[in-house]
Amino acid sequence: MAHIDPTLVGKVSSILTGRIPQAPPQEARAVVAGIRAMARRAPDIVAAVSKMDAAQLSATVPVYVLDREQWAAGTASSLGAVLGDELLSAHVGESQGGRLKALTAPSSALVSVEVGAGLALMAKSVLGQYDPLAPNADGAQVPGRLVLVAPNILEFQRAFDLDQRDLALWVCVHELTHAAQFAQAPWLRDYIISRARAMVKDATGSDASLALDSGPGGDISAIMSVLEGHAEFVMNAVPIGQLPSKRRLKTAMRTRRDNSSPWKKWLQRLTGMDMKMGQYAAGETFVSEVVKAVGVEGLNQLWDDPLNAPSIEEIASPLTWVHRVIGTDYLGRDS
């Protein structure tokens, strides 16, 4: 059985992402210190905006400020631990258009190279990531860890001449909203893992494509849309007084997402990143419509029980979810 080598995955990904932004040691240290300071501020903001009882627990999540290679290695390690090397390597082997099918047993090195190549585009783009699949740290009351990719934050800040501390805070609010979600809904981690394993297992047969509109894949698409949309909602609701350059940040982020070159858009479709962009939009619309109908407190009933998780159909019809989970008595109330 082939095993995923996170170190090799990181090295391959790093090579393919190209040069990182250069900074003198003093500036680099200041960037890292600023990112860490904003990670400490973010939990209070998440708690105030989201009104989630467990949001303050996100302050216990360990924070790692990493480079691209370290991010890719850590992501590969988490995926391998949760999905299992056997399932992950089998899917990688079968999803390459027949290239690896000719091999009865792809080597660990070959599978690791494939995974590294697959993570390369994301390694160059990701600003931060709450990783709920990482092992629990000592003393943490929430699973996982917060990862912030310093070179990418610096590159984005320079490209759009953004306030560095505001950008770091904005990213941290988004990612620690995810930590708050998992703290508020302890069932979330197993819900996602069980369906991810089932989806990948189903895709290792004759048809290696991942079904994302029905079955376990549909469940994952729906819950990921909610998680991403809710994090977008919270980060965009941070008061201007706490995030003075918020309008500039939102414009820069929108431009960054919209102005990808044709080859990059093709790669995004190939790696599934275009789906993540769609999740932001669909999920934020769902969250906004639910909040408009029943307020933030009504939305927060979503986290109470896995049966409250919306279906893929309900993502497109938020009031259908409101009727099913909350009932019609709440409709039209002040939010």
Show where each model-derived region lies.
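Auxiliary, metal-adjacent structural segments of Zn-dependent hydrolase domains
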Residues: 38-151
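A short mid-domain helix/strand-loop element embedded in enzyme catalytic domains
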Residues: 138-158, 195-211
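Catalytic Zn2+-binding segment of zinc metalloproteases
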Residues: 175-192
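Pan-zinc metallopeptidase signature
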Residues: 228-335
